[in-house]
């Protein structure tokens, strides 16, 4: 998952967990869910300061220290819906 010690909150992270439910390995989701929980705390500040919004957000790149602002080029680095994208894994777990 790591790209220079960061997580890319797009298909690069999610595809590592796709098999967890269908493979009867739901407990393997726990680290991702814990990470999403921690990220949401840091992403609350980003949503407020950068976008003037309530809730939380993250962009394409994030790390274990809670980095959530956009980085890199606009083409791939600006993805303020990454939090929604990664949260779909929570919903998939619920549906399963």
What are these regions (language model features)?
Residues 1-96:
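Substrate-binding groove/exosite segments of carbohydrate-active enzymes
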């Amino acid at each position: 998952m790591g790209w220079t010690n960061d997580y890319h909150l797009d298909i690069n992270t999610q595809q590592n967990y796709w098999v967890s439910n269908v493979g009867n390995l739901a407990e393997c989701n726990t680290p991702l869910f814990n990470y999403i929980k921690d990220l949401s705390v840091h992403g609350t500040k980003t949503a407020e300061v950068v976008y003037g919004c309530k809730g939380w957000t993250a962009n394409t790149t994030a790390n274990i220290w809670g980095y959530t602002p956009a980085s890199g080029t606009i083409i791939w680095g600006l993805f303020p819906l990454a939090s929604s994208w990664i949260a779909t894994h929570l919903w998939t777990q619920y549906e399963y």
